[in-house]
């Protein structure tokens, strides 16, 4: 199953994240290596959030990520939520089209 982790972020997020960016990316590395974190990045125009795509049996993988993400711990993320995403089109889709 796929899960989307949505982050709401502080104003000037792109500038304010710089001191913590390396820690955030290093924190993400094991999730990527295990195949749990598929894609992620900031939204653009305006940069008012970020979205990360996870693969797992439950939404706990995305919740676990958010709970200890340096961006969350340092107050750059003002709120987050996880939503299940039923994927049906494209490589890696969870539900195949007939």
Spans of features found by a protein language model:
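Conserved, structured core segments of small domains
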Residues: 1-98
């Amino acid at each position: 199953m796929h899960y989307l982790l949505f982050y709401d972020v502080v104003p000037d997020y792109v500038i304010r994240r710089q001191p913590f960016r390396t820690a955030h990316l290093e924190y993400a590395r094991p999730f990527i290596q295990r195949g749990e974190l598929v894609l992620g990045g900031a939204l653009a125009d305006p940069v008012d959030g970020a979205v990360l795509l996870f693969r797992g049996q439950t939404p706990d993988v995305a919740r676990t990520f958010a709970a200890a993400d340096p961006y969350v711990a340092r107050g750059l993320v003002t709120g987050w939520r996880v939503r299940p995403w039923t994927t049906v089109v494209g490589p890696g889709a969870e539900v195949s089209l007939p």
